[in-house]
Amino acid sequence: MAMELTERERIIRTYRHQDVDRIPMLDSAWKGTKKRWVLEGMPKGVSWEDYFDFDHLIRVQPDNSPRYEARILEEKERYRIRTTKWGSTEKVFYELDSTPETLSFYYDTPEKWEEAKQRMLTDYEDRIPWDYLKENYPKWEAEGRFKQLTVWFGFDVAHSRLTGTENMLVALLDEPEWAMDIFDTYLKTSLALCQKILDAGYKFDGIFWYDDMGYKGTPFFSAQTYRELLQPFHKKAVDWAHERGMVAELHSCGFIEPLLPDIVETGVDMLNPLEVKAGMDPQKLKTLYGDKIGFHGGINAQLWDDIDKVKAEMERIIPIMKEGGGYIFASDHSIPNSVSLENMREIATLAHKLGKY
């Protein structure tokens, strides 16, 4: 395609499997990764997306939490222990790129859930980042950015933030009504806040939601459980977006291939991140479902610190994934701090070269 497109045009056309000038390049980098790149020569004050000529991730997320009191319980040399607005207690390490360790969950029973539910249904003006929108939206529009609303709902954010994994998995089998009420409340409150943003005159191109449904080699639950308990809410989110002229992207880490036929059936437009290290095979998915859904990611992040290996992987995967449209270049999760500035330069250059149509 001879014409150069804006980011917004390029990404929307990719979602719709239409001709583009090149594949979009949308990824996220760890804090430690960006710090390393600055130490190795990337100018301070320049975004890494601009430096490497990537497209930009613009996402706005309303707060549909129960507003549990967030406070610091303990301070240590290497970590602090705190409560979160979702009712969990976690140990947060000071090292860059560390993952908090969740110690306990307050809303871990159906009875306590009723308290959380009422708190989530309570409206507060500051659930929406109005000042952030007012300050940045004109710039996004002027620069032709693709903009997503982050919808906060599903299995992942419920088990990891609210109830605990074991409690949620048991609930899927023994107390499905409780699990579905959680999914429903999360979705209703999040979409209501998103609608307020649209009603205020802000225009968005798509929705995005996190719902990690797999780990290494297997999903957390069966396809039947997905169909009966979770898919109806995924479908509602997708329909909500499509009714408003927006596209829908699902981020689901882990091995979720057994769920793909049902995910495709919901009408999801784009799937991310195609986690190779968990067992996902991007080329297989492209062959089976590439005419029905787009793919975002799939370049094994464990290879990015070995430039020869990651280049070979890109040369193997990108030509197949971009065929017929519907592919966005990215790692299979995010860019780790093992990736040097020089490696990232070469990766970005090759992605641009292989991604041209």
Segments (PLM) and residue ranges:
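Segments that shape or occlude catalytic/ligand-binding pockets
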Residues: R36-R71
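Active-site loop segments of alpha/beta catalytic cores
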Residues: M1-K35, E40, I81-T83, K112-Y357
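A contiguous, low-structure linker/loop signature
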Residues: E69-T122, E143-F146
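Short linear motifs in intrinsically disordered/low-complexity regions
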Residues: R22, S28, Y51-H56, N64, ...
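Surface-exposed flexible segments
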Residues: V38-V46, F93, D97-T99, N343
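Short, solvent-exposed loop/edge-beta patches enriched in aromatic
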Residues: D19, D53-H56, E74-K76, A142
